[in-house]
């Protein structure tokens, strides 16, 4: 059974995600559809790219990943397929898919050109349902990418910005905030552990305010209500509050800069 995943900024209040799933199942009846997230901040391509990039390794080989964070929908921007060794990516040509594609050594990019494998009526504002969902379904059914599109090299490139060391500081930013209010940063586990040991106290600067915090293995090693640093399940530094919300406590938002003073 083929797996098709969905990642969007559509939310679940409206019928958009359900319509995409309906289109997929009308074409490929035996696929398994899995939601990665539909709570990407509206039009935030970087956040969407990060969530896709960090989710890819946990799906079976041959999975088809549809990602739609598409502020340029209905314009001249292309729809593309990125063919990687172990998975396929479908979505808009705006950089959203590229970090996930770069996880594999080599990939090919196809511009979606065939009208045969999309809906008869394509709206200007909902290519997720009208283009990308049916394309993913037909790929799951075994239609070759060469029949759907043409190979291109002029796709929009994009690289995620990861945390880095600047003199005696580690600089990063918030990529994502989960439902617990944890601030998921772009600072990778390997970088943190190169400079900071578990149990060490350091200064955290965020939104111009300084906090003295500990780097701990998990929440339970801190006191209730205490701010802490930990490595989250996807391998990046998170700023948390034990049994609380770091987002609310620190007044932080996606895109805010984070500084750790070594």
Feature-to-residue mapping (PLM):
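Short acidic, Gly/Ser-rich segments with clustered Asp/Glu that frequently serve as metal-coordination loops
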Residues: 10-14, 72-74, 177-182, 244-246
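Conserved active-site and cofactor/substrate-binding residues in soluble primary-metabolism enzymes
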Residues: 15, 19, 28, 43, ...
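General beta-strand structural signal in soluble alpha/beta enzymes
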Residues: 6, 33-36, 67, 89-92, ...
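N-terminal glycine-/serine-/threonine-rich phosphate-binding loop
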Residues: 1-76
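Active-site histidine-anchored catalytic micro-motif
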Residues: 27, 47, 60-62, 67-68, ...
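Anionic-ligand-binding alpha/beta catalytic cores of soluble enzymes and soluble regulatory domains
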Residues: 119-187, 191, 196
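A conserved acidic, glycine/proline-rich C-terminal tail/linker
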Residues: 186-251
């Amino acid at each position: 059974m083929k797996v098709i995943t969905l990642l969007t900024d559509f939310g679940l209040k409206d019928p958009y995600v359900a319509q995409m799933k309906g289109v997929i199942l009308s074409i490929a009846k035996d696929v398994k559809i899995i939601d990665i997230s539909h709570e990407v901040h509206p039009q935030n391509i970087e956040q969407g790219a990060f969530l896709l990039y960090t989710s890819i390794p946990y799906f079976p080989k041959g999975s088809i990943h549809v990602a739609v964070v598409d502020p340029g929908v209905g314009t001249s921007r292309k729809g593309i397929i990125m063919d990687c060794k172990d998975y396929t990516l479908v979505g808009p040509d705006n950089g959203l898919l590229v970090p996930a594609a770069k996880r594999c050594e080599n990939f090919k990019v196809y511009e979606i050109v065939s009208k045969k494998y999309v809906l008869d009526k394509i709206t200007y504002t909902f290519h997720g349902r009208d283009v990308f969902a049916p394309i993913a379904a037909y790929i799951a059914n075994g239609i070759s990418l060469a029949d759907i599109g043409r190979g291109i090299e002029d796709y929009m490139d994009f690289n995620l910005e990861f945390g880095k060391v600047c003199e005696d500081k580690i600089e990063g930013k918030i990529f994502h905030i989960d439902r617990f209010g944890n601030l998921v940063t772009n600072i990778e586990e390997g970088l943190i552990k190169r400079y900071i040991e578990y149990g060490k106290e350091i200064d955290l600067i965020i939104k111009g305010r300084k906090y003295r915090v500990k780097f701990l293995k998990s929440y339970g090693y801190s006191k209730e209500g205490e701010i802490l640093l930990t490595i989250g399940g996807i391998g990046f530094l998170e700023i948390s509050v034990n049994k609380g919300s770091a987002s609310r406590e620190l007044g932080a938002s996606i895109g805010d800069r984070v500084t750790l003073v070594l």
